[in-house]
């Protein structure tokens, strides 16, 4: 017996929120939350069709950021604070894409965790 497909609830969100951008060496993830921290929309490079080494390019970061921002903009979000984490290559492209969609960026903070001489880093690549 087939069950009826459920429609997603379209809930209006507050016009303010936070964009969390995690740009690692291998991937880019963008999560947009409201002021309470509830997820409004999210996107990643893999979700947008990028595979392998193409996931860590600035273009993949731009497409990923646009996808998450459009969804949040359609739900009523207008002003965002940006939190960036990680050393990835697409950090700047992601912020420019947010502004291109129409979200007004109020502040940008870098929250990349830095060790106070903790674990030994991976060995250097010899190419």
Curated annotation (Swiss-Prot):
Family annotation (Pfam families): Ribosomal_S11
Gene Ontology MF annotations: rRNA binding; structural constituent of ribosome
Any Gene Ontology CC annotation: ribonucleoprotein complex
InterPro entries xrefs: Ribosomal_uS11 (IPR001971), Ribosomal_uS11_bac-type (IPR019981), Ribosomal_uS11_CS (IPR018102), Ribosomal_uS11_sf (IPR036967)
SUPFAM superfamilies: Translational machinery components (SSF53137)
TM regions (residue ranges): none
UniProt keyword annotation of Zinc-finger present: no
Keywords assigned: Ribonucleoprotein, Ribosomal protein, RNA-binding, rRNA-binding
GO BP term, example: translation
Functional summary from the UniProt entry: Located on the platform of the 30S subunit, it bridges several disparate RNA helices of the 16S rRNA. Forms part of the Shine-Dalgarno cleft in the 70S ribosome.
Family: Belongs to the universal ribosomal protein uS11 family.
Known partners and oligomeric status: Part of the 30S ribosomal subunit. Interacts with proteins S7 and S18. Binds to IF-3.
Record-given protein name: Small ribosomal subunit protein uS11
């Amino acid at each position: 017996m087939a069950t009826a497909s459920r429609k997603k609830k379209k809930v209006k969100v507050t016009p303010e929120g936070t964009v969390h951008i995690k740009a690692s060496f291998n991937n880019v993830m963008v999560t947009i939350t409201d002021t309470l921290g509830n997820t409004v929309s999210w996107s990643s490079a893999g979700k947008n069709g990028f595979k392998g080494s193409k996931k860590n390019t600035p273009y993949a970061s731009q497409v990923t950021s646009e996808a998450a921002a459009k969804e949040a903009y359609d739900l009523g979000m207008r002003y965002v604070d940006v939190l960036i984490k990680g050393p990835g290559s697409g950090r700047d492209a992601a912020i420019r894409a947010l502004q291109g969609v129409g979200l007004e960026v109020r502040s940008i903070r870098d929250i990349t965790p830095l060790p106070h001489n903790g674990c030994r880093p991976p060995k250097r690549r010899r190419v």
